Amino acid sequence: MNHKVESVQGLHDDAFALYNNAVRGTADYSADTLINNLNEGINTLKSCWKGKDAGVQIQNVITVYNALVNIRNVLGKLAADSSKIASNYREIQNANGAGLSALSTITSEDKTILPDYVDTADKVDITPDAEKGKAKIDAANDNIANFIREVSKYFNNIMNNWTVGTGRDEAKTAFETFNSQSTQYKETLSSVSSNITTALQNYVF
């Protein structure tokens, strides 16, 4: 077994906590909630905000959406891999007479990124429904930092516990990269939100 684990039960527990609380949880800061909010915001804006500039702004949201999908998939795989490693270790412990309870595993299904979006219309058009799209984008933006904080609780434990193994270092690099770019993601969403407000103020309905 090409893995080194300090605490089998600890790895199992943190894997499930990461998956249930930070990846798939129903809290405002879970990856799935952030992704769903941005997806709703994108779809709303596509239907009610037209023009080249609108297309650029919507594409900016898609860029952040895809980054969230990618890190969500990485974290889901990390949780699944960690749970399987813990389960395998437990089987070995029990084969040696430990008599401990078997450990369950996680199956994580990836979400799909969105294709690029372009609006070539010269005429600008926007409806009041854009405010609903803005609200969804703001909701996601408000919770990116909370998402990172929640992930870090369990992610750091997993990294300190599972010290050697295939896939570990890739997950570590991916999360550190997302974390380092999170300020830019937040600034991007704030800029889009501000542009929606300006467009609504300037447009004559």
Residue ranges and their predicted role:
Residues 1-205:
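N-terminal secretion-targeting helices of virulence/extracellular proteins
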